[in-house]
Design a protein with these regions (language model features):
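Two-component/phosphorelay signaling modules centered on CheY-like receiver
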Residues: 9, 17-36
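Acidic catalytic/metal-coordinating carboxylates
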Residues: 39-40, 66-69
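Active-site beta3 strand of CheY-like receiver
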Residues: 51-58
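Receiver (REC) domain active-site loop signature in two-component systems and cognate sites
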Residues: 60-62
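C-terminal output helix
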Residues: 91-93, 107, 111-120
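Helix-turn-helix DNA-binding segment
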Residues: 138-161
């Protein structure tokens, strides 16, 4: 079944190197992903949709705001977008720091294309599942709020048994 653009998800790529950005776009669009490119962390934070089903492929070292700073901004906004860091000059302590703060992976350039595609697909699938569960919780809450006090009492009795 073909997924709609809203449920298929988007891959955000934040990378200052145009050649790397373009090669990632080509690689992922060839696999039918919807891709949005940003050359800086500031541009990404100004334009991304925090409610989208998405994965963020984020360069660590960029002029202006670093990838680490972008991650901090997303944490402060309570945005749980999966982040895959990419870096040409990463070190172990940097990788550990990003992972402890919730990044999904830390990949060194040049990276294995098949492994990156597989990781992105896994993260988008998990994001779709999280969104579906959140929507179901909202629907359940809306239905529960419509119960009369008597119906709420009966439900509480049933659940407690």
């Amino acid at each position: 079944t073909q997924e709609s653009p809203d449920t298929a998800g988007v891959v955000y790529i934040v990378e200052d190197d145009e050649a790397v950005r373009d090669s990632l776009k080509w690689l992922l669009e060839a696999s039918s992903y919807r891709v949005e490119l940003f050359e800086s962390g500031e541009m990404f934070l100004a334009k991304f949709d925090p409610n989208a089903i998405a994965v963020l492929v984020l360069d660590v070292r960029m002029p202006g705001m670093s990838g680490l700073e972008v991650q901090e901004h997303l944490i402060a906004r309570k945005c749980d977008i999966p982040i895959i860091f990419i870096s040409g000059h990463g070190d172990v302590s940097m990788a550990v720091s990003t992972l402890k703060k919730g990044a999904v992976d830390f990949i060194e350039k040049p990276f294995d294309q098949a492994a990156l595609r597989s990781l992105i697909e896994k993260m988008l699938q998990e994001a779709r599942q999280r969104k579906a569960k959140a929507e179901q919780r909202s629907l359940n809450d809306a239905l529960l709020s419509k119960l009369t006090p008597r119906e709420q009492h009966v439900l509480e009795r049933i659940v407690s048994e």
